[in-house]
Amino acid sequence: MVTKESIISDLEKENVGPEFGEFLNSLQTDLNSEKPLIEQVKSQLETHFNLGPETQEFSRKNDNAPVDQLLTNYYNNYEVNVLEFVLQMGFCKDLSIPLNVWFVLDMISQLSTSKQDLPLDYYLVLNNSHTGKYSDFVRYLIYEAVGAEIHCFEQGDMPQQYRSSRWEDKVKGPALANRGPIRGNVGAGDRKITFHLLCKKTARMILVGDDRETDFEMSDRSFVTLLLDYYQRVGTTKKIDLLLLTNNYDTNMNNKLQQLKILESLNMLKSNCYVLDYQITADQVTANFNSYVEGIPAFRRHEIANFLKKRRTPKNADELIFKYVGRWNICYQKKFHQGNISIHQISGYLD
């Protein structure tokens, strides 16, 4: 596994400042403590980096709600048991890398103590152009918190500058070889941390999508791997709802539909379906430009609708889509119905 010493050495080589190495040197976890590991690491992060003012600022930007309440309410109000949780983190502005780690741990902590007995499995994706050099730092802290390493998809196309010999060793093995609770991919991209929570006992939905805005595209092979891994954990008798996430330039949707037809033939899908066609960028100019892009072509919409014609869009689909996009700045939004399928097209930006 990644050690404190190996991370500190990498941080020194990349000249990113001594504070992360200092923190790792001072990090002490007590397995015999009544306080959970995740809380121990969170507390030390908060103290060492003095994150109090920054968490307060994050709270202020969210109507002064306490951070723990924001996380708890977001989950409890979400009406499906698989959550894509997006935190807008200003890596280049006023929020620090340590604070992002704190939020990761806090989110896991909130779900772990929820009344709904979660979480059980995570598929964690860290996408940010500034997290590459801190990837091992983040991975180590999560290891300390929950006792499992993050692994990449073998097919993940990570930018060359993020590669290290140790990281490459991790991706040479079989995709999702680690059966611990956390697995994921570090890539380039805009300012966000995305959680895909696949809860093996209670999940009713799976999220499928390409994230080209963050330079990470889930290949068809990865898509199949994710589905097979999911069913290996939940059992093939469990049916799930389906949320298709596409974007304006998604050329792989037809291949994904072919894979979904296989699942349908195995009677693995429920009737509910949501389709969101999105194009979220980091700036308003690009978002306004994307507003003129048609989105899913008509023939592709027909393919989607034809495949999903026996399924239905839940009555609260609009509300769920709104919760998915969260506080994105929307420049263009259109929803239309093809048969009984509701498709939302959204173009916007993160401020």
Swiss-Prot record:
Protein name: ATP-dependent 6-phosphofructokinase subunit gamma
Gene from which the chain derives: PFK3
Additional free-text comment from the UniProt record: This subunit is only found in some Pichia species.
Superkingdom in the source lineage: Eukaryota
GO cellular component: cytoplasm
A Gene Ontology BP annotation from the UniProt entry: glycolytic process
Principal location class: cytoplasm
Organism: Komagataella phaffii (strain GS115 / ATCC 20864)
Gene3D superfamilies: 3.40.50.11920
Subunit record text: Heterododecamer of 4 alpha, 4 beta and 4 gamma chains. The gamma chain bridges the N-terminal halves of the alpha and beta subunits.
Functional description taken from the UniProt entry: Structural subunit of pyrophosphate--fructose 6-phosphate 1-phosphotransferase. Not required for catalytic activity. Fine-tunes allosteric regulation of the ATP-PFK by ATP, fructose 2,6-bisphosphate and AMP.
Phenotype seen when the gene is deleted: Decreased growth on nutrient limitation and reduced cell flocculation compared to wild-type.
